[in-house]
Amino acid sequence: WVCCLSKVFDSLLMWAYYNNHRGVCIGLNMEKVAKYFDASLGLIVDKHAHEVQYRDIIEKPDYFQNEEDFFHYQMCTKAKVWEHEQEARMFIFKPFPWIMLPDSNNKSDLIDRKEVRAFPRIGGECFESIYLGVNINEKESGLIKIAKKLNPDIKVYQMKKNTNAFKLDAIHINDE
């Protein structure tokens, strides 16, 4: 499982090529997300986001020299033309049976199989903000209700085209 994230919410290019300004951008508190990843059972989870490296030239590391560098290069390298995305990636690998086995020395250390997931859940407090695209329609605006149900304190913004510059502005929507 790969979760691709961005450090920016107001990129004209990303809003344009991800659903022509009709999508949403969700702001996460990564420190709070990491706490949930600490508690994930049965998973190999890397709770830290890896920043994507942008390159003009392909320089593959040697797998036999440094396995970690090789993995990072394969999973976190993109062409330099994508640099405006400021992307970071998180990885969660499928559970392995031996990770889910209880400690043989501690019989009370049984794992409740209902708590083992292939995808960790995060709490509503992890969702800090939601940005609605410039061209979002009324049907999609029902997302505000869903967002408020997850986190009543979530901040909701409507993206608007700036009339004086080639950029987007995030306008805070008052609570209704």
Where are these regions (language model features)?
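Catalytic-core loop-and-flanking beta/alpha module that positions acidic residues
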Residues: 1-176
